[in-house]
Amino acid sequence: AFRGDTFGVWKQGPMSFDELFAEWDICGLTQAALLPLDLTTSAGGWVVTNEQVEQLCRLHPDKFIGFASVDPHRPDAPEVLERAFREQGLRGLKLDPASQRFYPADPIAEPLYRLCEEYGRPVIFHAGLSWEPGALSKYSHPLAFEEVALHHPALRMCLAHFAWPWAR
């Protein structure tokens, strides 16, 4: 499978939703964001697809908040994201510049940022060091996001992982 062969990520052991949500109850969790990853151009596939996230969110809309992912290098990237927001009901965008190999301020991402602003949806960026094979941290250094924030003051952005190790 693509995930296992490319990233060493295998499906977790079987667990029913009832078991999962019982564990959540113990931990005081009520919801979780589901984050797919489109690596179409950098690695040849998806780690988790928008369709898989959509299906899980439809099963448990009270528990899961689904995000979309779009490889910014795809020629159809804006169309894929608009479909995710309008038709699939996904509520934000997950980008991983290190794995998707783009600088956050690269013009290829501009149409995606504009769509997020238009729909009022947040962007979660993987920021900082990545342990994934082939991921280049130069694309996810925290300073790389400054220009995006400057040019898109209305864009809601989250830098995941606090951009470790470039944090104090």
Label every model-predicted segment.
Residues A1-P111, L115, Y119, R168:
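Mid-domain alpha/beta scaffold segments of enzyme catalytic cores
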Residues R91-G92, F102-R168:
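Catalytic pocket-lining loop regions of alpha/beta-barrel enzymes
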